[in-house]
């Protein structure tokens, strides 16, 4: 009996053969390596691969390097796994989004420059109108001076009459009221230091990060659609501003031609009045 007791006492239960043991009691059991080629990486690792996560690692940098040169160093696109191609598609989608957003920024800079040009043209039109209006005041003063010069002289002298080639008409063209209002509005915003165009508010908001490459591609496509929509709206604004500025420049060119005629007429009459005054002083 003692031999049997010693036999049962010396025999220890095997942990490796008990299927009900916990995973923590596996002891020195050999672990089988996981197959990385058939299982997609976790969400945080994929997020770092796309540049959206905080854990940007050397592996993600290496992946971006492969995507950047289109797998030229690793056998080309045809030799890549489905997982690599999914990451490549997400990378290209993100790259396209960045290019679209770059085009939008360039268009916004062009719109800001066009807004400043519109304000400058508006101020130039105001200056042309004010300067031409002054010819009417000069004409009134000159007419009184010519009348006094004609009354001066001896009793038997021939009465002097000023020579005129035409009438001083002043501004004949009326400026476009819509352009004046638009230019005045932009000018006031510039003085107040306000932005000419508020940022677009119709862009879609994404509250969660994508958990797969396909979701990343779809999100980037949505961003591209928003960017292209903004770009189309800005280009439409630029086209309208270009038409307005072209019409205003043509109107100002015609106004300058009319004002030049009045300036030449005033110059001719002033020369005649000066000649009359010198003759009176020489007597």
Swiss-Prot record:
Per its record, what triggers expression of this gene product? Induced by infection with the rice blast fungus Magnaporthe oryzae. Induced by hydrogen peroxide, osmotic stress and drought stress.
As one GO molecular function, the record gives:
SNAP receptor activity
Q: Which GO terms describe its biological process?
A: defense response; protein transport
Q: Where in the cell is it found?
A: Membrane
Give a Gene Ontology cellular component term annotated to this protein.
SNARE complex
Q: Which UniProt keywords apply?
A: Membrane, Plant defense, Protein transport, Transport
Q: Show the segment(s) annotated as Disordered.
A: 1-64, 192-212
Distribution of this protein across tissues and organs: Expressed in roots, culms and leaves.
Pinpoint the t-SNARE coiled-coil homology domain residues: 218-280
Q: Which InterPro entries match?
A: NPSN/SNAP25-like_N_SNARE, T_SNARE_dom
Here the segments flagged for biased composition (Polar residues) are 198-212
What does the UniProt record say this protein does? t-SNARE involved in diverse vesicle trafficking and membrane fusion processes. May be involved in resistance to the rice blast fungus Magnaporthe oryzae. May contribute to host resistance to rice blast through interaction with SYP121.
Further facts: Plants overexpressing SNAP32 exhibit enhanced resistance to the fungal pathogen Magnaporthe oryzae. Plants silencing SNAP32 exhibit increased susceptibility to the fungal pathogen Magnaporthe oryzae.
Q: Which family does it belong to?
A: Belongs to the SNAP-25 family.
Assembly with partners or alone: Interacts with SYP121.
What name does this protein carry? Answer: SNAP25 homologous protein SNAP32
């Amino acid at each position: 009996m003692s031999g049997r007791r010693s036999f049962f006492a010396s025999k220890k239960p095997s942990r490796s053969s008990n299927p009900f043991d916990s995973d923590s009691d596996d002891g020195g059991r050999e672990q089988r390596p996981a197959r990385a080629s058939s299982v997609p990486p976790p969400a945080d690792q994929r997020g770092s691969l796309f540049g959206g996560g905080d854990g940007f690692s050397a592996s993600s940098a290496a992946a971006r390097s492969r995507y950047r040169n289109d797998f030229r160093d690793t056998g080309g696109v045809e030799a890549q796994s489905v997982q690599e191609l999914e990451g490549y598609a997400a990378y290209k989608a993100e790259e396209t989004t960045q290019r679209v957003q770059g085009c939008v920024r360039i268009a916004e800079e062009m719109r800001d420059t066009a807004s400043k040009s519109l304000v400058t043209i508006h101020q130039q039109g105001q200056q042309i109108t004010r300067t031409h209006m002054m010819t009417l005041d000069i004409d009134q003063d000159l007419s009184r001076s010519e009348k006094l010069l004609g009354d001066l002289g001896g009793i038997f002298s021939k009465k002097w009459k000023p020579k005129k080639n035409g009438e001083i008409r002043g501004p004949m063209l009326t400026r476009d009221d819509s352009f004046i209002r638009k230019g005045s509005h932009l000018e006031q915003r510039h003085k107040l230091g306000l932005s000419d165009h508020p940022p677009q508010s119709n862009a879609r908001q994404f509250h969660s990060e994508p958990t797969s490459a396909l979701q990343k591609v779809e999100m980037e496509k949505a961003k591209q659609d928003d960017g292209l929509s903004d770009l189309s709206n800005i280009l439409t604004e630029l086209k309208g501003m270009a038409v307005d500025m072209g019409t205003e420049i043509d109107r100002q060119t015609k106004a300058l031609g009319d004002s030049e005629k009045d300036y030449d007429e005033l110059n001719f009459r002033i020369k005649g009045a000066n000649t009359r005054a010198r003759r009176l002083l020489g007597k």
